[in-house]
C-alpha cells in the first residue's frame, strides 16, 4: 500500500499500479472517508476490493461540510491506525491530501444540489452540508477517475441521505461512476457504527441504542394494519425519544428513492425510517429500510 498527497501523485499511482496494465482493465474502486476508521468503514473497503483493479481510499476531513459550531477542529485524526486498518483490508492506495492540496485556492465554485433532496432532513438541520459534500466528492471523483474514464465508488447506507444525494449528482452530471451502497455496520446491541460514537460517555453509549430501537418501532407501527397517520406516529416517536433524554431533530418515514413523504398505501420494501437526535453533546443519525 502506498500513500499519496496530491492529485498528480494519485493519478500517477493509479496508472502505475500493476492492475491497470491488463487489457480492458485499470478501473479504480474508491472508498472516500474522513478517517477515524471503524469496522463499518473497513467493511466498505472490503466490499470495494473486488469491484476494481486498483483500490483507493481517501482520508480527508472536509471543512466545507462542517457548520461553524460543529466539530471540525476536534474531529479525531487517527492516521497511523487508519493506515494499518486500510492495508489489512487490501487497500492499494491511500489518498490523503492536505487542505492546500485539494483546495489550493478559496473554493468559490461549489455544487448546489437539488434542494428537494438536499434541503430536507439533514440539509434542513445542517444548512450547506450537502453543498460541501457534493463539492468535495466531485473533486475526489475527478482525482480518482479522470484518467481511467470511470470506476466504482462505495458509500455506506449509514449516511442514507448522503448516498441518495451522491447518486443524484452522478445521474445529473452523467458521471462514469457506479455508486454502490454498503450496508450499515452495527454493534452487537444494534447501535450503528459511527466515528462520533467515541464522543459518548459510558452511560450515553449504553443508552445510544434507543435511536435504532425508535426507528424499528416506528417502522413496525407504520406497517401495522389500521395504523394511524404517519404524522401521528412520527410525533409519538419524537416524544418517546425526548422522554428518554434525547434532543431529536427528526424521526420520519420517507420513500427510499427521493426521501419525500410516502403516498398512501406505499408498498413494503420501498420505505425508509430515518432519525437524527442528540444525546448529550453527541449528534447521532441512523436509518432502517422496510
From Swiss-Prot:
Enzyme type, top EC level: ligase
InterPro entries for the chain: Pantoate_ligase (IPR003721), Pantoate_ligase_C (IPR042176), Rossmann-like_a/b/a_fold (IPR014729)
Listed EC numbers: 6.3.2.1
A GO MF label: ATP binding
Catalytic residues (positions): 41
Family of the protein in this entry: Belongs to the pantothenate synthetase family.
Biological role stated in the UniProt entry: Catalyzes the condensation of pantoate with beta-alanine in an ATP-dependent reaction via a pantoyl-adenylate intermediate.
Protein name as it appears in the record: Pantothenate synthetase
Organism field: Acidovorax ebreus (strain TPSY) (Diaphorobacter sp. (strain TPSY))
Lineage: Bacteria, Pseudomonadati, Pseudomonadota, Betaproteobacteria, Burkholderiales
Gene for this chain: panC
Amino acid at each position: 500500500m502506498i500513500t499519496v498527497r496530491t492529485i498528480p501523485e494519485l493519478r500517477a499511482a493509479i496508472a502505475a499500479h500493476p492492475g491497470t496494465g491488463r487489457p480492458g482493465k485499470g478501473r479504480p474502486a474508491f472508498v472516500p472517508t474522513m478517517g477515524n476508521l471503524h469496522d463499518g468503514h473497513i467493511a466498505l473497503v472490503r466490499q470495494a476490493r473486488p469491484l476494481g483493479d486498483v483500490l483507493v481510499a481517501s482520508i480527508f476531513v472536509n471543512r466545507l461540510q462542517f457548520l461553524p459550531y460543529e466539530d471540525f477542529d476536534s474531529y479525531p485524526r487517527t492516521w497511523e491506525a487508519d493506515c494499518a486498518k486500510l492495508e489489512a483490508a487490501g487497500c492499494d492506495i491511500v489518498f490523503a491530501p492536505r487542505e492546500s492540496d485539494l483546495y489550493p485556492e478559496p473554493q468559490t465554485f461549489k455544487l448546489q444540489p437539488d434542494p428537494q433532496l438536499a434541503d430536507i432532513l439533514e440539509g434542513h438541520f445542517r444548512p450547506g452540508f450537502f453543498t460541501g459534500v457534493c463539492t468535495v466528492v466531485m473533486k475526489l471523483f475527478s482525482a480518482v477517475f479522470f484518467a481511467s474514464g470511470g470506476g466504482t465508488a462505495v458509500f455506506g447506507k449509514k449516511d442514507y441521505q448522503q448516498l441518495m444525494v451522491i447518486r443524484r449528482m452522478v445521474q445529473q452530471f452523467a458521471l462514469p461512476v457506479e455508486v454502490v451502497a454498503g450496508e450499515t455496520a452495527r454493534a452487537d446491541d444494534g447501535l450503528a457504527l459511527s466515528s462520533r460514537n467515541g464522543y459518548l460517555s459510558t452511560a450515553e453509549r449504553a443508552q445510544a441504542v434507543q435511536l435504532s430501537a425508535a426507528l424499528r418501532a416506528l417502522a413496525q407501527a407504520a406497517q401495522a394494519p389500521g395504523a394511524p397517520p404517519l404524522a401521528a406516529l412520527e410525533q409519538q416517536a419524537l416524544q418517546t425519544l425526548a422522554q428518554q433524554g434525547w434532543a431529536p431533530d427528526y424521526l420520519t418515514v420517507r420513500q427510499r428513492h427521493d426521501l419525500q413523504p410516502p403516498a398512501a398505501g406505499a408498498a413494503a420494501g420501498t420505505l425508509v425510517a430515518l432519525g437524527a437526535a442528540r444525546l448529550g453533546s453527541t449528534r447521532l443519525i441512523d436509518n432502517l429500510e422496510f
